[in-house]
Structures are given as C-alpha cells and as structure tokens.
Amino acid sequence: MSGGGNNVVNKVFYATSYHPIQAGSIDGTDVAPHDNGVRRALLCYNAGLYDPSGDSKAVGDPYCTLFVGRLSHHTTEDTLREVMSKYGRIKNLRLVRHIVTGASRGYGFVEYETEKEMLRAYEDAHHSLIDGREIIVDYNRQQLMPGWIPRRLGGGLGGRKESGQLRFGGRDRPFRAPLRPIPHEDLKKLGIQLPPEGRYMSRTQIPSPPRRKGSVSDREEEYYREKSSVEREEEFKERSSLRSYHSHRSSAHTHSSHRRRSKDREECSREESRSDRKERARGMEDRYGDNKGEVSGSKRSKRSEEDRSRKRHKHLPSHHHRRSYSQDHHSSD
C-alpha cells in the first residue's frame, strides 16, 4: 500500500502479537533489525529463551492486571495504591524493585478485582500524574501478548527518543500507516503481522486489550472500539434519538394513564356525591316524616280531648240551671 498526506499520518494500528523486527519499525514493515537491541531480542525470540510464565512473582489474573510505567523512583506502594484505587478495588499490587538495592525500577503491576475495574483504569489512568510524573498504563503484555520479549532483552514497547531504542506497536507509540509499498511476502516469511489495510484506527481511539474468549459483551465492545469516531458519533445520536423517542412515549403513556385515573376518580367522586345526596334526602324524608306523624298525632289527640270535653259539658246541667232547680224544689216544700 502506498499513500501520503496528513490523513495517512494520523492513521495507526497496533500489534496484537510481538515480533522484535516489527517492533523496531515505525510503520511495522521492516524486514531486518536496525539496532543491536532488536538483534538481541530477535535471538531470544527465535531461540525461545524467554518464558513469560517463568516469573514466579507474576501472580494473579492477567486479564485483571495492568502494567503501570514511567513512575518516579520516589513513588511508593502506598502512593501507587492510593492513586490507582480511584478506578476500582485493588486485589494485588507489586512495585518492581532492584533485587540488590531495593530501589524502585519505575514500573509496577496492579491487579483489580474484576475486568471491568481494570478496563476503567486502562482507559482513564493513562497519562495521568503521580508524584509529578506522567505515567503510562497498558495491559499485562508479559502474560497476554504472544511472542513477548521484555525491554531488558532488547524488546519491549515504547521508550524515549534519547535512548535510541524506540519500540512501536504499543499504546504509547502505535505503528503509523505505511507511506511505502508493503513487502507482503517478506513479512509473511518472517511471521510478522501485516498492516490492516483499509482498517486503520485514528489516534483518538483507544486500542482494546485482550479479553477472555467466548464473551459476547467482549466482542461487542471490540467491535465498538474499532469503529471510526464518526460512526460512533452517528451511533450515539441514533441511540440518543431512540432513547428520546421511548422516553417521550413513556411520558405520554404515563400522562395518559394519569388522565384516565384522574377521570375515573372524578366519575367515582360524582357517583359517590349523587349517592350521598340520595342517602341524605332519604334520611331527611324519614326524619321529617316522623315529625309530621308526631305533630299530626298530637293535633288529633288534642281535637279528641276537646270533643270529649264538649260532650261532657253538653250532658251536664249548667250551674244556673242547678240553682234554679234547687230553689224550685225548696219552694215546693
């Protein structure tokens, strides 16, 4: 592949397996070692002199472990733990020290309780500051990257320009998209990973670390990470639009439900009011009916007593009549 321009320069790719010659090449297309360090690493690589499982101190789950580099030599285990615990629960932490002097070697390993916590630190802690030094964070390549050769044997990744032994393909220094034709056959003979023509990543994308096989969520996450920033933005807008649509429908449904419940309560209240009014009316009729009966009965009783009184007075002689009768009786005597 050939190309040019800024668009090509800004396109990168990352190594998924380690090869010393490729690691020494800025675009991953070298077919011969260009410095003594690469030659030494190639010798170890071909002879199988490095065994990543031979480090007795490399314990723990590699899928939950991060490499932390470029630490200050004054940074302690406590300081490293305090900073890295912001991203999750730390299960184990090891600051690598010189076997004789005990001085810090400037790097360490942090194991988290879960892969999710490790990923959070992998994404957020990279290029953060600890004791005034900008650190680098990467996955545990020692145990997870096929063919890995460490820095002390001429391999590794990254490095500083002043050292004269830069290594490419890692998170800090990815391979650039080649500006020259790719020697496909030569690379295949050496067993070197070919550049992913047409599938380069941008520098703003974060390369995904190795994940356990068989996880659907891992495949989805890798697919998402490999998308361009434009595709991710479009997908984000689409998901946001769908969430907004469903939220609007849910809100409308909730509002409609509230209105129906409110209407039902109003109708129920009206029914209860009508029922209450009828009950009160019947109660008042009953009470007034009883009072009317009592009043009517009282009136009838009074009229009956008056009638009886008149009848008695009618049958009894009057006082004047009695006196006349008495006088007449005495006169006759």
UniProtKB/Swiss-Prot annotation:
Subcellular location(s) per record: Nucleus speckle
Tissue: Ubiquitous.
Pfam families, alphabetized: RRM_1
InterPro entries: Nucleotide-bd_a/b_plait_sf, RBD_domain_sf, RRM_dom, snRNP35_RRM, U1_U11-U12_snRNP_70-35kDa
Boundaries of every RRM domain copy: 64-142
Biased composition (Basic residues): 245-262, 310-324
Biased composition (Basic and acidic residues): 159-175, 215-241, 263-293
GO biological process, one term: RNA splicing
Keywords annotated in UniProt: mRNA processing, mRNA splicing, Nucleus, Phosphoprotein, Ribonucleoprotein, Spliceosome
CDD domains (alphabetical): RRM_snRNP35 (cd12237)
Keyword Nucleus: yes
A Gene Ontology term for the protein's cellular component: nuclear speck
Keyword Cell membrane: no
GO MF entries: RNA binding
Region (Disordered): 154-333
Function: May facilitate 5' splice site recognition in the minor spliceosome. May be involved in interactions with components of the major spliceosome bound to the pyrimidine tract of an upstream U2-type intron.
Subunit text: Part of the U11 snRNP, a component of the minor U12-type spliceosome. U11 and U12 snRNPs exist not only as monoparticles but also as a preformed U11/U12 di-snRNP complex. Interacts with CYP95, SCL28, SCL30, SCL30A, SCL33, SC35, SR30, SR34, RS31, RS40, RSZ21 and RS2Z33.
Name of the molecule in the record: U11/U12 small nuclear ribonucleoprotein 35 kDa protein
Gene name for this UniProt entry: SNRNP35
